[in-house]
UniProtKB/Swiss-Prot annotation:
InterPro entries (alphabetical): Hfq (IPR005001), LSM_dom_sf (IPR010920), Sm (IPR047575)
NCBIfam families: Hfq, PRK00395.1
GO BP, sorted A to Z: regulation of DNA-templated transcription; regulation of RNA stability; regulation of translation, ncRNA-mediated
Role description: RNA chaperone that binds small regulatory RNA (sRNAs) and mRNAs to facilitate mRNA translational regulation in response to envelope stress, environmental stress and changes in metabolite concentrations. Also binds with high specificity to tRNAs.
Organism: Dechloromonas aromatica (strain RCB)
Protein name: RNA-binding protein Hfq
Length: 78
């Protein structure tokens, strides 16, 4: 993945993780997963609900937070 993609993706996922924001993750096959982002790396997102699921990023279509996320604060920290 290019650095430009990482400049948006990492701060967004990190804000979701840090603020414990509930998310809906839609996969490319249409399945909807719900939970909180526990952790992530270059290839996977750990999504915690009643269990922790490892979701491969290449299978993710959309990440929808349950509430607005402030990325300005996250970008200022970098």
């Amino acid at each position: 993945m290019s650095n430009k993609g990482q400049l948006l993706q990492d701060p967004f996922l990190n804000a979701l993780r840090r603020e414990h924001v509930p998310v809906s993750i839609y996969l490319v096959n249409g399945i909807k997963l719900q939970g909180q982002v526990e952790s992530f790396d270059q290839y996977v997102v750990l999504l915690k609900n009643t269990v922790t699921q490892m979701v491969y990023k290449h299978a993710i279509s959309t990440v929808v937070p349950a509430r607005p996320v402030n990325l300005q604060q996250e970008q200022a920290a970098e």
